[in-house]
Design a protein with these regions (language model features):
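Fe(II)/2-oxoglutarate oxygenase catalytic core
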Residues: 1-199
């Protein structure tokens, strides 16, 4: 199934909110491709692309990650940020949301707080678990390459310009976000490489 969305999905009233059945236009049961009005890809769905072996190998570590939570993903969680209440009862200036089961694995780029690239804690503290994800990550990369070869090539070129210590070997990726049993709110990811494409 391929479909061109002629109208832009409105941000107002949706961003940060939860999906509702009334928002649905199509029920997709097989492979599908949706494109924006400008012809660029919005969504490519490939069912059954990952081998059972890679999925089964990765599952225990991915399941273990459900205990990793964040209180900093308001749009993703579908809940507004509020001031944190400290243990002593005082209101903090720090804005948080209720914890959602999400974490990042792979490698972080530089930021103001950390002016250097680095491994995520899960990579450095759980190298065996990280190793079990590698076949799955490589298979997702190959699905991406087959579905959107130009986007894959652009992302791969950017990865090759990055120090190899901070690229997931054999892929054009540096980082994975693992959202575990969380119903996402409408949101736009930040930090994605715009010439590439996000793979879920």
């Amino acid at each position: 199934m391929a479909s061109l969305l002629r109208e832009r999905f409105p941000d107002k009233g949706f961003r940060g909110g939860r999906p509702d059945p009334a928002h649905l236009r199509d029920l997709v049961e097989g492979d599908a491709a949706y494109y924006k009005a400008d012809g660029s890809p919005l969504l490519i769905l490939r069912r059954g692309g990952v081998s059972p072996g890679a999925a089964e190998l990765a599952y225990p570590f991915l399941h273990q990650l459900r205990t990793s939570v964040s209180t900093n993903r308001a749009n993703y969680s579908g809940v507004e940020k509020r001031n944190r209440v400290r243990k002593d009862g005082l209101i903090s200036n720090t804005l948080v949301v209720p914890p959602v089961s999400t974490t990042v694995v792979g490698y972080f780029d530089r930021s103001q707080r950390f002016p250097f690239c680095r491994e995520t804690a899960l990579v450095s503290q759980h190298p065996e678990g990280w190793g079990t994800l590698q076949p799955l990550i490589r298979e997702v990369s190959e699905i991406f390459r087959a579905a959107l070869p130009q986007r894959w090539a652009a992302q791969d070129q950017a990865a090759r310009a990055t120090h190899p210590a901070y690229v997931i070997a054999g892929t054009p990726y540096t980082t994975l976000t693992v959202n575990n049993t969380v119903a996402a709110g409408y949101h736009k990811d930040s930090g994605d490489y715009h010439a590439g494409f996000g793979c879920l």
